[in-house]
Regions:
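Short acidic-glycine-tyrosine-enriched beta hairpin
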Residues: 71, 110-129
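Bacterial N-terminal signal peptides
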Residues: 8-18
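A short, N-terminal "cap"/entry segment at the start of jelly-roll beta-barrel domains
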Residues: 22-75, 159-165
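Conserved short histidine dyad/triad with adjacent acidic residue
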Residues: 72-92, 124-130
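Ligand-binding loop in jelly-roll beta-barrel domains
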Residues: 118, 127-152
Length: 165
């Protein structure tokens, strides 16, 4: 008799709770959304598509877009400056995250000492009114990765001003 009472108690309370807990099979957990770019992209260095950035204004400077488009939108791209290249005092509209891959990249903020960065170095360059010159050391070409939330631009502050090296 006692076993029958226990069984009745279990069936009365435990079974409905188990059914309610199981419900319709739906849960409150939301599926994890897949990122927009959910495909593998592999581009060996030998397959990079390098183009001239601005043959008239920046001779020899090359760019290879990795994602986005450096000329019109958010982007990530490799830039290549020829050894000894020097850009005059200028600003950019958007912030840029930069990682040096090869060569010695030299930047001189207006009125401040220059900094020289080698492979593996990183800097965040503010957009807007950050006036600076950019030079690639004469020893070798400079290659660096740039990521930006907006298109690349180079607005010369004074075309007569060039870095003194």
């Amino acid at each position: 008799m006692r076993a029958r009472n226990v069984l009745t108690l279990v069936m009365t309370f435990a079974f409905p709770v188990a059914v309610l807990a199981q419900g319709s099979g739906k849960t409150n957990a939301k599926p994890t959304p897949k990122p927009a770019e959910s495909r593998l992209v592999v581009v060996p260095a030998s397959d990079m598509k390098w183009t001239d950035l601005d043959p008239a204004g920046a001779p020899g400077v090359k760019v290879a877009d990795l994602w986005g488009n450096h000329a019109s939108s958010t982007f990530g791209a490799l830039f290549k400056l020829p050894a000894g290249f020097a850009a005059p005092l200028h600003v950019h509209t958007y912030d840029m995250k930069v990682v040096i891959i090869s060569g010695t990249y030299i930047q001189a903020p207006e009125g401040k000492p220059e900094f020289r960065l080698g492979p593996g170095s990183y800097f965040l360059q503010p957009g807007g009114n950050y006036r600076h010159t950019t030079t690639c050391d004469k020893a070798s070409d400079c290659v660096f990765l740039v990521e930006s939330k907006g298109p690349f631009d180079l607005n010369i502050v004074d075309a007569r001003t060039a870095p003194s090296r």
